[in-house]
């Protein structure tokens, strides 16, 4: 668990402390930040465990504005390890993966991918154009608030494409971000303590017979 976070904070999408030295104070600062990340990661993902219904037992009562996720069975959770698409197809899995990416400072990757999925379903030319510009300003242009890590050539191509937006404007960038998540964050998610706990089958305890 800790090793996964340590790798994450050194990954290009979420450096921990740029320009930090190697002295005792800086080392102590990095260790403190790493402990904070670990605590934050556990608290975020434990939320899903505490606020999810058991499989086949949806919550009843007043509807909440907040979306309720049905906690998967161990068998369902194990399917996520078979393919990245299996994880993304699960509402619970997607929510947990987003929390994991947030702990790695890479949440913009999944947000961009989801924005592209929504964009491709858009039929209206007017909406297509406005959504294309929003995706560009949010994720693509230099110093965008959620700037994704793609090459300059791809960014330039997108800047040209959005002038006459089509559903394929962001295809190349989406594929690159998908590959980045699949090859980096996804394997670390599968190694996380949270995911391993989901895959564990509950132990059946039997009470000793009275003599």
Swiss-Prot record:
Q: Which UniProt keywords apply?
A: Cell cycle, Cell membrane, Cytoplasm, GTPase activation, Membrane, Nucleus, Phosphoprotein, Signal transduction inhibitor, Translation regulation
Which lineage do the record's taxonomy fields give for this organism?
Eukaryota, Metazoa, Chordata, Craniata, Vertebrata
Q: Which is a GO BP term held by this UniProt record?
A: negative regulation of signal transduction
* Organism this protein belongs to: Bos taurus
Which intervals of the chain are annotated as region Necessary to inhibit protein synthesis? 79-116
* Region entry Disordered, spans: 14-33, 49-71
Q: What is this protein called?
A: Regulator of G-protein signaling 2
Main location per UniProt? membrane
Domain RGS per the UniProt entry, residue ranges: 83-199
Q: Tell me yes or no: is Transmembrane helix among this UniProt entry's keywords.
A: no
Question: Which stretches does the entry tag as region Necessary for membrane association?
Answer: 32-66
Q: Which GO terms describe its molecular function?
A: GTPase activator activity
Cell compartments where the protein resides: Cell membrane; Cytoplasm; Nucleus, Nucleolus
Q: Which SMART domains match?
A: RGS
Job of this protein: Regulates G protein-coupled receptor signaling cascades. Inhibits signal transduction by increasing the GTPase activity of G protein alpha subunits, thereby driving them into their inactive GDP-bound form. It is involved in the negative regulation of the angiotensin-activated signaling pathway. Plays a role in the regulation of blood pressure in response to signaling via G protein-coupled receptors and GNAQ. Plays a role in regulating the constriction and relaxation of vascular smooth muscle. Binds EIF2B5 and blocks its activity, thereby inhibiting the translation of mRNA into protein.
GO-annotated cellular components: cytoplasm; nucleolus; nucleus; plasma membrane
This protein's assembly is summarised as: Interacts with GNAQ. Does not interact with GNAI1 and GNAI3. Interacts with EIF2B5. Interacts with PRKG1 (isoform alpha).
Identify the domain of life: Eukaryota
List the Pfam families hit by this protein, alphabetically: RGS (PF00615)
Q: Which InterPro entries match?
A: RGS, RGS2_RGS, RGS_sf, RGS_subdom1/3, RGS_subdomain_2
Post-translational modification (record): Phosphorylated by protein kinase C. Phosphorylation by PRKG1 leads to activation of RGS2 activity.
């Amino acid at each position: 668990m800790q090793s996964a976070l340590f790798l994450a904070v050194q990954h290009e999408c979420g450096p921990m402390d740029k320009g930090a030295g190697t002295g005792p104070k800086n080392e102590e600062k990095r260790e403190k930040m790493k402990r904070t990340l670990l605590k934050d990661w556990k608290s975020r993902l434990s939320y899903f465990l505490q606020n999810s219904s058991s499989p086949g037992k949806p919550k009843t009562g007043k509807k909440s504005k907040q979306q309720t996720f049905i906690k998967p069975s161990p068998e369902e959770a194990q399917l996520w390890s078979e393919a990245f698409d299996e994880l993304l197809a699960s509402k619970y899995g997607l929510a947990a993966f987003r929390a994991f990416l947030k702990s790695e400072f890479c949440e913009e990757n999944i947000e961009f991918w989801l924005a592209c999925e929504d964009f491709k379903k858009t039929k209206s030319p007017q909406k297509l154009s406005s959504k294309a510009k929003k995706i560009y300003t949010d994720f693509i242009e230099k110093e965008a608030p959620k700037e994704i890590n793609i090459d300059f050539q791809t960014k330039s191509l997108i800047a040209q494409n959005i002038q006459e937006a089509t559903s394929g404007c962001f295809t190349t960038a989406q594929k690159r971000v998908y590959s980045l998540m699949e090859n980096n964050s996804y394997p670390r998610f599968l190694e996380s303590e949270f995911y391993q706990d989901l895959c564990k089958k509950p132990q059946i305890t039997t009470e000793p017979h009275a003599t």
